[in-house]
Amino acid sequence: MITYLAEKRDQVIAYYMALAADNTLSATQLDEKYKKQGYIQFKNAAYHNGELITIIWAQGHMLELKEPEDYKADWKEWRLDTLPIIPEKFEYKVMTQKEWQFKKVKDFFDKSRMIVWATDIDREGSHIAYSISLMTGILDQEGPKKMIKSLWVDELTPTKIQEGVKKLREIDYRVLQAIEAQTRAIADWLLGMNASRALSLLLEDKIGLKLDRSGKDGKIAVGRIKTVALFLIYLRELAIRDFVPTTYWELEATFEHPNGIYKGNYVPLDIPYSKGDKKGEPWEGDCPTREDWEKLIQNPKIIGDSNKGVIVEHEVELKEKRPPRLYCLDSIQEELGKLLGLTAKEVLEGPCQELYEVRKLITYPRSLSFYISRERYETLKQQAPALARLVGFSEEDLVFPERPDGFFVNDKKGANHSAVVPTTVIPTEEEVEALPDTLKIVYKAVIRRTLTMFFPKYQYEQTTIITQVGAGKFRTVGQVPKNPGWQVLFQDSASLLDGVIEESEARDLIKVQTNDTVTSHLVPAERHVKKPPRHTNSTWLRAMRTAGRDLDDEELIAIMKQIKGLGTAATRGAILDEIVVNKWVIVKQGKIYLSELGWLICETLKDERVLSQPETTAIWEQSLSKIAEGTNTQEKFLRNIYRYLGIENPHNNLIENLINAVDRTDYTPFQDFIEQAVAKADGKLGNCPLCGKAVKVLGKSKVAQCEDNILSKEEREAGATPVCSFNFWITVGFIKDKKKTLTKKQISDLLSDKGRTNLIKNIEGKYGPFDAYAYLSFNEEKGIYQVNLEVDKATSKK
């Protein structure tokens, strides 16, 4: 028997439909038939000599690294004296609710002659197959115990799957991919587990900050990527907070020529700034006041005689512009996310995954490559006329170069991972138009981007005029389109032009010649430094992708460019989601704001560069990538992590650095937040009016009580009397089974100086629903506190 391990059920169905000769069921019917069974079996003489084939899926990541308490019971409790937590050997465990499927996988692996890794072809897909193979015992550190091959396909079309099965690969490269991913996971576990515990414990010890461990009110956590990603938002918040409106002046000129009027911008002299923040830097032609420019105009070394000008240079060039690169996950998420109003995660897990897995219309969308192989280029070349018709063009519009352009085609860079392009499945125009709008927009965008390979380059005529006025020179640039080339593909999709066709500030110019004289009018133009805008989902993603480009170290800059920023295109959306769930940021109307908890974490960690700056990611990712290349090892990489955690390194390690960071941070601005957070974590809703202690609601109780009014079961059985008598029912209404339970906010309002709740709507009364305010009072006759209602006559129903 041959067992294929797929990553998801959709893959299993795609493989089965491509390989099973006698299948008559649709994908939906197959899904319904086999989803509970967990696998599909069949025979086909065309594959593996007719041997029984089992295709089973892993339900994504089926295994996870064990928790600290799985190694040692002492590690379950959060204590500083147990840090750093470093297991002798890292081990996996089966995720909850996936044990049943894992047992099936192991059973089929045990019975099979050969196993085929048929998961996604990225490092996480390889990690899934590798870790399951280790856990089931068919693979260990010395190598495979059975024959293991790899199915390497980047589109789920029958043709490509059939070709891939006939050309199964060795697993050597995928093992290196998997070890890289495994090493990253272990390193992130070590850093996150130790730093999160240390920071939480230190903040609780020094300032009393305590958050509910459920995370519902926020979470104190540290991660190699997510903390640095948070700092991108923190730095933008600082820039907004510290922004000082600034006005400056630049020099413009209007020139009168016999053939008309044109404008020019002053070309700054090669001199440095003499004062201010830019002192010593090359002058950019700006002045802090209009008066400064008025004086400079009179200076014969700058301008001098400013009434007349002479055209000293006039150049006309025919220029070409390449189209954008083919789509990779980064670019498709940014451009189409902005167009469709979706987050990066939604673009990937929505239209992209459906077009790939279900519709089979685009290649693997998680690819980070924007190259294709020569073989795929030739296939797309044959498909180009049919693809062109789907977006309103014909074969006559296409141009097929004699040889592929290396800008798109690279066998070395496009062989394993292809750019996102259409597959060999070409739907009819009617089928495309029948697609849901989101899928149609994404699919047509991929077609257009791909067809740019078979359209001429955009050509334009650029005219540059240099006009001499006294000692000064002014530059004027104009552009005239000559051949729209590939840009015609986007003329009917204006919303896609942003980021594809750059808007030029140049313009068509009047006809002039060198040595023509002109009349000049010089005008200092007022400019304003703009306040930095708040990050949105798309600008934050771009900041993640370009993080580290402003580092001082040229080598680190090169590394950050190579690794394409923080995280991966597939994980960045999830990182933002996690930051929101952790209550570090608040998203309002698409804009990202730093929360008080986010501010507190950033203020604490701002000087700990490993946790706040992109250099760490650059160095880590460079070292990790060498594992996949075979030039580095997991052992060597983790040795450095252990040193940072304090092994054989008593100073300048993680724990010591965090202790110092908490000690030197001023938490005075966060006192109100800290008090509120502690109250929530302790379940405190307010202060007892009798003794001043905390009032709480236990579990699903309908009674709010002073903490000194609460007795344990043992105390009640022993006949103990509460120290404080304060408690009250927290339900309102007059119909027994329809009473409203007050929210925590409403209970807090009752116990605050405010003394009553906001308006509570639709309270059930004997004569129908009504609206009322609730307030707390003492019933002297009964000797108890109770909630009373003040009916709102203006809004209550009659």
Regions of interest found by a model, annotated:
Residues M1, I85-E91, S200-I220, E313-K321, ...:
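Short hinge/gating elements
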Residues M1-M193, R197, C287-R290, G499-V500, ...:
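Intrinsically disordered, low-complexity regulatory segments
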Residues I2-T3, K98, K145-K146, D242, ...:
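Basic, low-complexity terminal or inter-domain segments flanking catalytic cores
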Residues D31-Y71, T227-S274, F393, M453-E502, ...:
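Structured, non-catalytic alpha/beta "coupling" segments that mediate domain-domain communication
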Residues K103, D110, P158-F255, E317:
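C-terminal or mid-to-C-terminal helical accessory/interaction module adjacent to the motor/catalytic core
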Residues K275-Y327:
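Metal- or metallocofactor-binding catalytic centers and their adjacent structured scaffolds
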Residues R359-K360, K583:
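Glycine-centered, phosphate/nucleic-acid-interacting loop/turn motifs that mediate DNA/RNA or nucleotide
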